[in-house]
Amino acid sequence: MTRISRCLITSLAAAMLFATSWIIAPAAIAQSLPVDAFYGHYQGSGVAENSDSLYFGVTVRDLDVKIGAEGAGFYVEWTSVIRGGGDPNNPDIRRRTQRMDFTAGAAANVFNAVGRQDPRTDGLAWAQVHDQTLSVHVMQITAAGGYVIQTYNRTLEGTGMRLKFINVANGEPQREVDARLVKVGN
């Protein structure tokens, strides 16, 4: 190998190493947001799909989410207004509100749901923060001995958050909701 070839290869290798350090370094030092970064009032809408959506269509959901301090922890309260079924010109409307309170768990960025620690009754629930996403997981054991896991991933983006909800029963995806919400208050 000539001296010029070796210099060229060495220079290219150094340039590639420098370039990849700019890509890898920020990811390596990125830390999860503190839970209070998610505090606020968010509103928006999304679309729910399930395995029958191809034949029966999707349902539209209006969403209202509040996240704030509660004692030594925090709470997440969400309301879903579901429009679907019935007459397409005048669909059935269902409104569902849930609230969970969380306290710090043993591991960093993991939180236990207050009073939701038995999957046979009210469900086993916990929350975690990873990067810019606050995830709430709820697991329940069904009467037939199966299980259902619901995951609500709330990712902060720009002026609000993206919600990705996934409902899995016995390992099979049942429903997904993809929504965008705007922060409307603190």
What are these model-derived regions, one by one?
Residues 117-158:
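Acidic, glycine-rich flexible loop segments
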Residues 80-134:
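Predominantly extracellular/secreted and cell-surface proteins with exposed
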Residues 153, 164-174:
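Short, exposed beta-strand-loop hairpins at the edges of beta-sheets
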Residues 1-15:
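Bacterial N-terminal signal peptides that target proteins for export
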Residues 17-27:
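C-terminal segment of classical bacterial N-terminal signal peptides
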Residues 77-80, 113, 135-142, 164-168:
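Short beta-strand segments that buttress and anchor functional surface loops
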Residues 61-67, 98-100, 122-127, 149-156, ...:
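Hydrophobic/aromatic beta-strand elements that line small-molecule binding cavities or substrate pockets
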Residues 32-33, 41-77, 91-95, 147, ...:
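Short, solvent-exposed loop/hinge segments that bridge or flank secondary-structure elements
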